[in-house]
Amino acid sequence: MSIFCIVKDNDEQFDCNIDMDFSYNAIEEWKHKWQPKKASGRKGSKRNYGYVTYRVTNESKHFPNSKFEDKALAIALRQWGLRTQDIRFKRVTGTADIEMKFADKQDDKLFRDKPGTLAYAYFPNGQKIGGDITFNDSVIWTTNGKPINAYEVFPDKYKPNTKTKLRTYNMVHTLLHECGHAIGLKHCQQHKHCIMYPYYNGKVQLHDHDVQRIQSIYGARGLSRRIIDYFRKRMLRKWGG
């Protein structure tokens, strides 16, 4: 089983002072990749890319308004799609190439055995489970990854005047990282600002090294830096990141 991004954490309350790190540090690229069919485009022209489909089978309790989750997914997947020639991403309601879900430690054995695990994913491997991603919903997901007052999360455990802060995790950063694995990238240890760096760094945009690696697998889309920056800033502005 190809599991990634097992996060070390000894505090079940996920104290904001604990450093999180990803444990699988291989840097070679995976031997398999997505090869979706390139169907006809408008007016019968041949598209030079294919769609990798995805769906969310179980949503996060931290985003009761699914629009936040939808935006996070769109930002993460579109950033990869803007940089690749061969693939785009499309959300579906039925059978999908990549299935994403949120589960807590009561529902997922790995999260019970390793309570500090933030998420795990499978490489594309030609099998049904290839590309699937599971996020630990026992941790606190937010739009910005900043510490949050404990009373806001656990009003039954903390008093309104508590000064206790709990660590939260940026949903877009984690989606970007896990989606990188789901489309074939392993960790990068050389550049600490990379999305695929093996330590959680909260970055919400692709580093040039991330781009070079994914384009070595799926080709370069060829959009100008100005256009890419425009779409990226527009997406992040709507998200609030």
Summary of predicted features, one role per range:
Residues 1-241:
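Zinc-dependent metalloendopeptidases
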